[in-house]
Regions:
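Long, contiguous binding/interaction regions
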Residues: 1-80
């Protein structure tokens, strides 16, 4: 992957998105490589978060983060 960057982001889903296929949508909408490093989902409590490693051209990583944010996911970069 020439010109590729890697970025860790912590994503928190609001209760209304816990049942939605957010990662599926992200993978279909973006060419960034998405790797789930850690996750916690409690469907009954309506709580979900995941730590993603995104890889690809910097512009594509920004696009992936924007896609998540536009859908209501809180995205926090780790170690930028």
């Amino acid at each position: 992957m020439s010109g590729a960057s890697r970025r860790l982001v912590h994503c928190t889903l609001p209760p209304e998105l816990v049942h939605q296929p957010i990662l599926h949508g992200l993978v279909r909408a973006s060419t960034a490589v998405v790797n789930v490093r850690r996750a916690n989902v409690d469907v009954e409590a309506g709580v979900a978060w995941f730590l993603l490693e995104l890889a690809g051209p910097p512009a594509e990583l920004e696009r992936a983060e924007a896609w998540l944010t536009e859908r209501g996911v809180t995205v926090e970069p780790i170690g930028r």
